[in-house]
Each structure stands twice: as structure tokens, then as C-alpha cells.
């Protein structure tokens, strides 16, 4: 292994690390703009749905997208095949 190969490999590692840091920073910036009530809203929505359907926390996703003149609240729920009533019978 020559010194040039060693230095070339480190450069690619540095670029990968830089790319990963940019992704992390972008994610952190997007999280900073979320309102404080969003986690509480997600918990309350989960509680209401859990009354009727057997569902876990990771099956409910709440996102807020802000645009210039509006905001969109996106709610994604992965529903199971059957409701609680069907499984209790």
C-alpha cells in the first residue's frame, strides 16, 4: 500500500463524513421548526385510535409542512387488518 492510496482513501472517507453531517444538520434544522404541540397531538390521536383499533405508536406519524402562506398537517396511520371488535368476538 502506497502513501498515495492511503491519502486517497481518507479523502473519500472525509467526503462521506461531510455528507452525513449535512444530512444530520438538515434534519436538525427541520426539527427546530416543528411546534411544541406536535408530539402531544400525536399521543392524543394515538389514544383515540387505540380505543377502536389495536395499533402501536410507530404506526402513527404526524408531520407539519410549512409553505409560504400555509401549513399542511400530514397524518399517516398504518391500520391493521381487523378492528378490536372483530378480534374480541
From Swiss-Prot:
GO biological process, one term: regulation of division septum assembly
Pfam families (UniProt xref): MinE (PF03776)
Keywords assigned: Cell cycle, Cell division
InterPro entries from the UniProt entry: MinE, MinE_sf
Record keyword Cell division present: yes
Summary of the function given for this chain in its UniProt record: Prevents the cell division inhibition by proteins MinC and MinD at internal division sites while permitting inhibition at polar sites. This ensures cell division at the proper site by restricting the formation of a division septum at the midpoint of the long axis of the cell.
Family: Belongs to the MinE family.
UniProt-listed NCBIfam families: minE (TIGR01215), PRK00296.1 (NF001422)
Protein name: Cell division topological specificity factor
Organismal lineage: Bacteria, Pseudomonadati, Pseudomonadota, Gammaproteobacteria, Legionellales
Gene of this entry: minE
Amino acid at each position: 500500500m502506497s502513501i498515495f492510496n492511503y491519502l486517497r482513501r481518507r479523502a473519500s472517507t472525509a467526503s462521506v463524513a461531510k455528507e452525513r453531517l449535512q444530512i444530520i444538520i438538515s434534519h436538525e434544522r427541520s426539527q427546530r421548526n416543528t411546534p411544541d404541540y406536535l408530539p402531544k397531538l400525536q399521543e392524543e390521536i394515538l389514544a383515540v385510535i387505540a380505543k377502536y383499533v389495536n395499533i402501536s405508536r410507530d404506526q402513527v406519524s404526524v408531520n407539519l409542512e410549512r409553505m409560504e402562506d400555509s401549513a399542511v398537517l400530514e397524518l399517516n396511520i398504518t391500520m391493521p387488518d381487523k378492528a378490536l371488535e372483530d378480534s374480541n368476538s
